[in-house]
Amino acid sequence: MGIVIGKIELNNEKQIIGELKKKIKGVNFHIAQKVIMLSGNVASIKGNKLIQSEEKQIVDILQRFKGLYSHNYGLKEEALAKIRRIENVYRYIRVRQGYPVRGRTKSNANTVKRQRNVSTGVKTKRKKMYLLNGKPTNRKERKIFNKLKKLQEKKNKEQKKSQKCKTKK
């Protein structure tokens, strides 16, 4: 087992400078070199040649270093997890609304928009009003009006027949 700093574990078989610079955010080659020099070690030393007291010195120096993120190393994974959770919430909302999760909606997803905006518009209300008034204005309205008229006539005839049957009994 190598040096453990917060949640990060450094590899024993590689040089400490390379591991520090690769694994810890905010540590470059020069900072890693200075940390190792402050701990009193040679720059090219590997992790398996360190004593526990030297490991503790390196960890203490890194935790006191002001240029780095706080002593809780490994926050990158937690931050990414938060971002993923927020993305999932957004996706859930989009799916519930019926919109696409990714991509444009200004020019794309027109079928969804059409389905959502289904309502009785002004044209259909006008047609209903004309039918009620009895004056169709165009060919389609006349067809509908004539069909309705025929249906009403059939109903009236059926009602008259049923009334005649009742009076005979």
Curated annotation (Swiss-Prot):
The keyword rRNA-binding applies. Residues 149-169 are annotated as: Disordered. Gene3D superfamilies: 30s ribosomal protein s13, domain 2. It is found in: Mitochondrion. GO terms for molecular function: rRNA binding. Belongs to the universal ribosomal protein uS13 family. Located at the top of the head of the small subunit, it contacts several helices of the small subunit rRNA. This is Small ribosomal subunit protein uS13m. The lineage of its organism: Eukaryota, Amoebozoa, Evosea, Eumycetozoa, Dictyostelia.
